[in-house]
Regions:
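ATP-binding N-terminal substructure of ATP-dependent carboxylate-amine bond-forming enzymes
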Residues: 1-131, 135-137, 141, 160-170, ...
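Active-site nucleotide/adenylate-binding loops and adjacent lid/helix of ATP-dependent enzymes
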Residues: 2-10, 14-15, 21-25, 90, ...
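ATP-dependent carboxylate activation and anion-phosphoryl transfer catalytic cores
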Residues: 2-4, 10-13, 150, 174, ...
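Hydrophobic beta-strand scaffold residues
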Residues: 38, 124-125, 153, 183, ...
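A glycine- and small-aliphatic-rich helix-loop capping segment at beta-alpha/alpha-beta transitions
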Residues: 116-125, 201, 206, 334-335
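Phosphate-binding site of ATP-dependent enzymes
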Residues: 200-284, 305-312
């Protein structure tokens, strides 16, 4: 059988650069070398594209991958049919690429930017297309679409950089008039809980908004929802399939960046500790959100389940983590799809889309 040429993109000019390196290491180690010619292409924090020439993918999370002597400068050409270009001395090497697997998170990576380049180049790629990627990355747009789809979610308030600069007092008063403390403060366009904070009083709210505005010009203030954090992995194009539910006990104030990637205090429960009826409701809502957002390929959909059984939508991630401890692959492994088979399925869905 003819091998497919798969370009795995990782890194990126993003606040979630390091998370991407961890995810990419896992993906590259699990892709079947008998089925695929693999081209690992990293984007540095400065925006340089590098065709990684090493064999040890552990160099990615170690941060030493850029120093590999066999690396070459690279680019994906927007010209259809040109594929992957790499540069060595005065020579340009062209490689046909059958599919791109973006293992990148956050701004410039998960928000439709990379997807737009691949769309122009005519190269199939894993994950949702441009419009869905952009909509899912912007939490305000996600909120509006989920609301139109009739999905219960936390009440929220938008604070903009311009409005906050014009009058902090008005912005803080508006939030306090609507919500009781604590509240969550989230940049509109980041993932992995980057820039997210829980504010318990006015001074903490002001500081959290200031910090979040460093990541995005729009910030969401959300009511605090007390409940179990439940996640569902979704796979598919026209007929998406939802995995079993998983639950996260963060062991912290909330499931922030440190709890996800640094601390070992979080505990995962697969399946989630919820009733069978609630499980089916969560899975149905996950697919409803997935379809409403126009997703294809994959996404992870996150919810809260309150003590009375009410299910509240939290957010959707179009390129979920693929690290060794990430929920997306773990949920499908528990649903009967091993990690390597999941990668095969995602590549097949990309070629079908």
């Amino acid at each position: 059988m003819k091998k497919l040429s798969v370009c795995v993109l990782f890194g990126g000019v993003s606040s979630e650069h390091e998370v991407s390196l961890r995810s990419a290491e896992s993906v590259l180690n699990r892709l079947d070398k008998d089925k695929y010619h693999i081209f690992p292409v990293g984007i540095t924090k400065d925006g340089d594209w590098i065709l990684f020439g090493g064999k040890d993918y552990g160099m990615l999370p170690a941060g030493t991958w850029q120093n590999c002597e066999d690396n070459r400068r690279a680019a994906l050409s927007p010209v259809r049919g040109q594929g992957l270009l790499s540069f060595e001395n005065d020579c340009v090497v062209r490689e046909r690429i059958d599919v791109v697997f973006p293992v990148m998170h956050g701004e410039n990576c998960e928000d439709g930017a990379i997807q737009g380049l691949l769309q122009i180049a005519g190269i199939p790629y894993v994950g949702p297309h441009v419009a869905a990627s952009a909509a899912c990355m912007d939490k305000t747009i996600t909120k509006l679409i989920a609301d139109a789809a009739g999905v219960r979610q936390a009440a929220w308030q938008l604070v903009t950089r311009e409005g906050f600069a014009r009058s902090r007092e008005n912005a803080l008063n508006t939030v306090e008039a609507r919500f009781a403390y604590p509240v969550f403060v989230k940049p509109a366009g980041t993932g992995s809980s980057v820039g997210v904070a829980k504010a318990k009083d006015r001074s903490a709210l002001e500081a959290a908004i200031e910090a979040a505005l460093k990541y995005d010009r729009k910030v969401l203030i959300e009511e605090f929802i007390s409940g179990q954090e439940v996640e569902v992995a979704v796979l598919g194009n026209d007929n998406p399939f939802a995995s079993i539910c998983g639950e996260i006990d963060s062991g912290a104030e909330f499931y922030d960046y440190d709890a996800k990637y640094i601390s070992d205090c979080a505990h995962l429960y697969i399946p989630a500790r919820i009733s069978e009826q609630t499980t089916e409701q969560v899975r149905e809502l996950a697919v409803r959100v997935y379809k409403a957002m126009g997703c294809r390929g994959m996404s992870r959909v996150d919810f809260f389940v309150k003590s009375d059984g009410e299910v509240v939508f939290n957010e959707i991630n179009t390129i979920p983590g693929f690290t060794s401890i990430s929920m997306y692959p773990k949920l499908f492994e528990a649903s009967g799809i091993p990690y390597s088979d999941l990668l095969d399925d995602l590549i097949a869905l990309a070629l079908e889309a």
